[in-house]
């Protein structure tokens, strides 16, 4: 049998595919073996002696079904696992994910003025120190801290108001004292009222 390696190589170049995709008609081997140029190969392709094989379809439907099941937690038991827990999902990757989530939340709260820069820095350092397990715990801590700060501010305002009131009272007392001292030792003693004249009551006549 005549070797058709040259014709197969030229046909793959003309058809722009691999040599495995080229089909040569076994009944026309003598005519195909005479073709030694790309022009002759094109003529044979036109005549149907050389054909490009169709692409084989490799269905992914089963793979898609398996992926959907794995997202639900199926096929993930101990028997399906290859590698240690650290190899499958490193703790460093988990740490990075958690840090990014918590820091993103802190940045969002700072930009929307929900927290000031001092609280942002305090919470940022606590996040770095592994104080918060997840986003919910961080949000609860922020709300608790804000409530505590508001309570302290209310108490401080009440204390300041009380101090101001006491100070004003002391100033009034001091002013009254200075006023009394300025008037002199007996200046503020009221003059004695004249004695009231007693009306003479007529004596009752005794009955005889």
From Swiss-Prot:
Q: Which GO terms describe its biological process?
A: translation
Q: What ranges does the record list as Basic and acidic residues composition bias?
A: 144-163
Q: Which InterPro entries does the annotation name?
A: 60S_ribosomal_eL19_sf, Ribosomal_eL19, Ribosomal_eL19_CS, Ribosomal_eL19_dom, Ribosomal_eL19_dom1, Ribosomal_eL19_euk
Signal peptide region: none
| Cross-referenced Pfam families | Ribosomal_L19e (PF01280), Ribosomal_L19e_C (PF25476)
Compositional bias per record (Basic residues), positions renumbered to this chain:
164-175
What the record says about family reads: Belongs to the eukaryotic ribosomal protein eL19 family.
State the protein's name. Large ribosomal subunit protein eL19y
Provide the species name.
Answer: Arabidopsis thaliana
Please state the gene responsible for encoding this protein: RPL19C
């Amino acid at each position: 049998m005549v070797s058709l390696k040259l014709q197969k190589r030229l046909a793959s170049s003309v058809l722009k595919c691999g040599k495995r995709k080229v089909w040569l008609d076994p009944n026309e081997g003598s005519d195909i073996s005479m073709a030694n140029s790309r022009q002759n190969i094109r003529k044979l392709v036109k005549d149907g002696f050389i054909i490009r094989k169709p692409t084989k379809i490799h269905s992914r439907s089963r793979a898609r079904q398996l992926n959907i099941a794995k997202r639900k937690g199926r096929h993930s038991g101990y028997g399906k696992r290859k590698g240690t827990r650290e190899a499958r999902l490193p703790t460093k990757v988990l740490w990075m994910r958690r840090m990014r989530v918590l820091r993103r939340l802190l940045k969002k709260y700072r930009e929307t003025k929900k927290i000031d820069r001092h609280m942002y820095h305090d919470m940022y350092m606590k996040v770095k120190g592994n104080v918060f397990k997840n986003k919910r715990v961080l949000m609860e801590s922020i709300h608790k801290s804000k409530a505590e700060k508001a309570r302290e501010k209310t108490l401080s305002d009440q204390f300041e108001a009380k101090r101001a009131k006491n100070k004003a009272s002391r100033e009034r007392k001091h002013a009254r004292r200075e006023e009394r001292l300025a008037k002199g030792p007996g200046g503020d003693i009221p003059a004695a009222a004249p004695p009231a004249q007693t009306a003479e009551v007529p004596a009752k006549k005794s009955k005889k």
